[in-house]
A protein has these predicted regions:
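Substrate/cofactor-recognition hotspot
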Residues: 2-194
Length: 194
């Protein structure tokens, strides 16, 4: 396997991959591990496959959910829920995700394809999902530069209030984090363990 350095696009898509699968910020340590895997030669879709094979994903995210409920859950990570998107748009995505699962594709590959699509020039009907994904990615990026948290509930809470109502810039993302008690640039102290 050839070694390479993760570029800015890889880094952005890594945040989005974690968001799509876990609806969470990665945190500093998890992000470093993911980028190290890319530096060792893994593609982002391979990283997605590795993430969807983790105990956290298989037990804490999808657990015992039916296929239909798994689809609904992953759709919610992109804001594709009632009140935030139209029924036709949700049906289109639901059918797409379900068909991909039935053909044997992994959640890692499906989410990778979804984030790549939303990061490009998506159909205008998915503009709000793209804005939400970008806003979450910016918040996750700023958060993960300062915080080493690895607890899934905490990492999900970081993004819980992010919306697609406005397009976030750096200042808006920092204000959001300040509002949830996670100011940008904070130094997080950790307790040493013997």
């Amino acid at each position: 396997m050839l070694s390479r350095m993760a570029n800015s696009s890889d880094i952005d898509l890594t945040y989005k991959l974690v968001i799509g699968l876990f609806n969470a910020a990665p945190g500093k340590l998890n992000l470093a591990a993911l980028l190290s895997a890319i530096d060792r030669g893994l593609s982002l879709s391979q990283v997605g496959d590795a993430l969807d094979s983790t105990v956290v994903f298989t037990q804490e995210i999808i657990g015992d959910l039916s296929e239909a409920n798994q689809v609904s859950l992953i759709m919610s990570h992109f804001g594709l829920v009632e009140g935030q998107s139209t029924g036709n748009d949700r049906k289109l995505v639901r059918d797409y995700f379900t068909e991909r699962l039935k053909t044997g594709d992994s959640w890692g590959q499906i989410v990778y394809d979804a984030i790549t699509y939303l990061s490009g020039n998506p159909d205008p009907r998915f503009a709000k999902a793209a804005v939400l994904l970008n806003n979450k990615a910016l918040v996750a990026q700023i958060y993960s530069q300062s915080y080493v948290e690895a607890n899934l509930n905490v990492l999900q809470h970081v993004l819980a209030g992010v919306s697609a109502d406005d397009i976030f810039d750096q200042a808006a993302a920092e204000a959001y984090l300040e509002g949830i008690g996670k100011p940008a640039g904070a130094v997080e102290l950790t307790q040493a363990k013997d």
